[in-house]
Amino acid sequence: MSDTPQAILLMGPTASGKTGLALELARRFPVEIVSVDSALVYRDMDIGTAKPTAEEMAACPHHLIDVISPLQSYSAAQFHADANRLIADIQARGKLPLLVGGTMLYYKALLEGLSDLPQADAALRAELDADAALLGWPAMHARLAELDPATASRLNPNDSQRIHRALEVCLLSGKPMSELIAQGKEAAAGFRFLPLALVPRERGWLHARIAERFRIMLEQGFLDEVSRLRAKYPELTLNLPSMRCVGYRQAWEHQDGLYGHDEFVERGVAATRQLAKRQLTWTRSLDAIPVDAQRDGLAGLLGDAVDDFLAGRPPAESLRYAGDF
């Protein structure tokens, strides 16, 4: 196997069949699966996140599942560091990293790098706001052009939010924001990825799968799971990232009597559809190969693409889905 860090990325919207396809690939290749899902990191949240079953996880090693409490948070920066470490570790064991999930921000961090930008500073922000109120944003844009011409050249002189952030980064770090972003992309360029994105040929197909999966989760005891979470973690609130996972807020509010069971199901399914729509929007912005999730024999075609990737060949052009999604 190549010494260059390399991995297969299998992304796609919720309920598009990623887990099943990943397990099919695990039967053909010596893979270890790394979850790319901001919901699967939480312990005790199994049903509502459609976490792989114990049997599925026993089929091959899985990583980044059940790593934190629902009271904690997990950032894209943490994922980026963990994924880079795991890719290296898995490859050192002679295995192939297979990254699977639907958190597109995490994929963006892998494919485009994660820039080491400084955190916002309240005092500097207030100072820049005062300058802008006095001078106007075109003058602040001219100031940015002196410090970071590359960033200024792509911003409208009245784009206050982005000019503000670019100036803040320059003044806090002592470096142009464009330089810091380029460094992140340079680090990402040291990896070889085969980015495969499952997309639905028909939106109705995906919507039907979403509704069916929500029905199955209810049969499996999703509402009981939410009750157990609330009992086990008294500090849990709807403001925590874990409870922003699709379905959990709706279940919580249903249990609190805000609406009945039928409306809870409608809201849960609708929220999942909205998530899928956002995931597909993200997918269009990423440099990934769109693949028809409804295509017959898809597992074999993806396996052939992995064979080509490992041999240093480009995937067959026939794999790429040319339609709208």
From Swiss-Prot:
The keyword DNA damage does not apply. Gene3D superfamilies: 1.10.20.140, P-loop containing nucleotide triphosphate hydrolases. Residues 37-40, 161-165, 244-249 are annotated as: Interaction with substrate tRNA. Its cofactor is Mg(2+). It comes from the Bacteria. One of its GO terms (molecular function) is tRNA dimethylallyltransferase activity. GO terms for biological process: tRNA modification. This is tRNA dimethylallyltransferase. The gene is miaA.
